[in-house]
Amino acid sequence: MSFTEEETKLGKSLFEACSFTERPIAKDSHLETVRQVMRKNIPATITTSDLGLFTDEEEATKKKEIIQGDITIDGTTPLHVICSSFPSDATAEELEVALEMMRELFQWGAGWMLLDEQGQTPGCVAWDRSKAEARDSVLASVYNEIVSAGTRSEVFLRRINKSENVEFLSDDDDEEMDVDDDEEDESRDGEETGDIQQAIADAIKQAKEAGLEVVVDGETVEEVPELVGDKEDEKNNESAAQNEVDLAGSQMDYLKDKLTYTDDNKTLITTQNDGVMMDWEDEIMQKSADLLVSRADKESDGPVVLNVGFGLGIIDTYLQSKKPSKHYICEAHPDVLEKMEKDGWMDKPGVTVLVGRWQDTLPGLLSQGVYFDGMYYDTFSENYSDLVDFFDHVVGLLAPTGVFSFFNGLGADRQVCYDVYKNVVEVDLQEYGLNVEYQVIKVNKDVTGADGHVWDGIKRRYWVVEDFYLPVCTF
């Protein structure tokens, strides 16, 4: 991005105002500077590198090193500078001016998730500084402003993505575009449907070979479904498998992947060393199990519970200790099902194993009139949109006095993302008539620390935040 001499001068004045080198921080100086610069069409995402403001060789070196990694560096923006420079001894009046400066930048397109040369978002910078101060300090207010903006942004983007055909076409283009789009959608849908069907067929085949009963839509499957295919398809599939995919983001590829339980049964990993589940989650699972039975009728024969995603079986083991009258477990991966069979889960009294994806197995429960005192969701390779789709089933299957929860790892690799999605979940649950509160569970420092040994051999740390927010969702 290049700027004229006049634009560069304006950009530098913006960064100077956001650095708060002059006190007091006032509307007629600091805030007015931001407003004037924005009105001159200087982007709110302008960076120090755009203006050649690197102060030393070390900063430039760090940027080069990070760019060579697996994240995209944007640069130090005015928001970063506000978060790093706002004085901790600021008055209430100065704080309000700084917050207005941030709001002004957000109105002009400033990004809450842009990364500086150290790979930090503005929220990361503010959080690190506020940790050293009291949580109710002025620095915490700066951090909370970032979280509020991030929440608004994510909710807005979700609404846009849910909208259909957000395009403006001329009458001449409309018909042609519709035809092209339909053909492209049919092709894409066909590919995705084929992948899903193949993954389901593979899972059913392995489950049947292991002697398991397979139930889909409430009916027992006697034969493995046959799919149309030929040797050329198999050859193409083998070739595609050689290209590494993101197993954490692709359910079809995940269901085809070989999973491994470590010898000590403390970790379940993919062939890419993704941590599907790890035993550091034990305390979280214990308290989640306690939660799931907390609202059950004490005069009944025992709670009726559902867990989606078996993993290491931690939460299901705790649930068994609660003496449930009915205990449903939904699991789709053939390697996990094999482990469950080996460990005797298929023969436990009151346990019903739903073999397959929850999208395929839970609808059958709706027609059977099953209601749960507690429902838990903890899947791998699914996205937030899948969790929101699961809310539909919660509404239909949760007893009026029941409680729903899930493994809340949304954005847990950054505190600011974790806090933003904590709020986003609340907004989405409200649309389904569900209320949510959070119980805070402290996570062991061996997990959150920079040198956490529990991550040895794991491809990517999926948890860095200090507190786990356990969702308590009720009608």
From Swiss-Prot:
A GO cellular component annotated for this chain's UniProt record is: cytoplasm
Just give the chief location class: cytoplasm
UniProt subcellular location: Cytoplasm; Nucleus
InterPro entries, from UniProt?
Arginine_N-MeTrfase_2, RMT2/GAMT_Mtase, RMT2_dom, SAM-dependent_MTases_sf
Protein's UniProt name: Protein arginine N-methyltransferase 2
Ranges of Acidic residues compositional bias?
A: 169-194
List the PROSITE patterns.
Answer: SAM_RMT2
Query: A GO term (biological process) for this protein?
Result: methylation
Q: Which residues bind S-adenosyl-L-methionine?
A: 254, 285, 310-315, 331-333, 358-359, 378
Q: Which SUPFAM superfamilies match?
A: S-adenosyl-L-methionine-dependent methyltransferases
Q: Where is this region: Disordered?
A: 167-194
Name the family: Belongs to the class I-like SAM-binding methyltransferase superfamily. RMT2 methyltransferase family.
The protein's Enzyme Commission number: 2.1.1.-
Q: Which GO terms describe its molecular function?
A: protein arginine N5-methyltransferase activity
**What would be the name of the gene that encodes this protein?**
RMT2
Domain RMT2 intervals: 247-475
Per UniProt, the keywords (alphabetical) are:
Cytoplasm, Methyltransferase, Nucleus, S-adenosyl-L-methionine, Transferase
Task: Relate the assembly described in the record.
Answer: Monomer.
Q: What does this protein do?
A: S-adenosyl-L-methionine-dependent protein-arginine N-methyltransferase that methylates the delta-nitrogen atom of arginine residues to form N5-methylarginine (type IV) in target proteins. Monomethylates ribosomal protein L12.
Top-tier EC class: transferase
